[in-house]
Amino acid sequence: EQIAEFKEAFSLFDKDGDGTITTKELGTVMRSLGQNPTEAELQDMINEVDADGNGTIDFPEFLTMMARKMKDTDSEEEIREAFRVFDKDGNGYISAAELRHVMTNLGEKLTDEEVDEMIREADIDGDGQVNYEEFV
């Protein structure tokens, strides 16, 4: 299950589908998430997990990176920041429209049904949107 999710995330990054993530591809995804990394920062991020030193990240290296990230479970601040990326209007809730917007920016074309399904999965109190507690 987890591996399948990571595979999906990997293909979001791997825009040309060649099985590796370049600094360019990494930059594209990060910018679509509202980050603005420098070329050097992107290179550092890749170097951190680039076990074979070829300058790109392949899927096994990506898994290593994700495992590390999961281990030092994201700081409260990182989680809040991620929430803010989705919560465009800053009202403390992620609506279906906001979720669709971010996913579209990531190159994920989701049907309304898929977006609604994602909201339903996280929406504990049944109000049709996701608040911070539900997001975490």
Curated annotation (Swiss-Prot):
Domain of life according to the entry: Eukaryota
Pfam families hit by this protein: EF-hand_7
* Keyword flag Repeat: yes
Indicate which residues the UniProt annotation says bind Ca(2+) 3: 87, 89, 91, 93, 98
Which amino acid positions bind Ca(2+) 1, per UniProt?
Answer: 14, 16, 18, 20, 25
Q: Which of this chain's residues are annotated to bind Ca(2+) 2?
A: 50, 52, 54, 56, 61
Q: Which GO terms describe its molecular function?
A: calcium ion binding
What does the UniProt keyword field contain?
A: Calcium, Metal-binding, Methylation, Repeat
Q: Which family does it belong to?
A: Belongs to the calmodulin family.
Share any extra remarks: This protein has four functional calcium-binding sites.
Protein name (Swiss-Prot/TrEMBL):
Calmodulin-A
Say which species the protein is native to.
Answer: Oryzias latipes (Japanese rice fish)
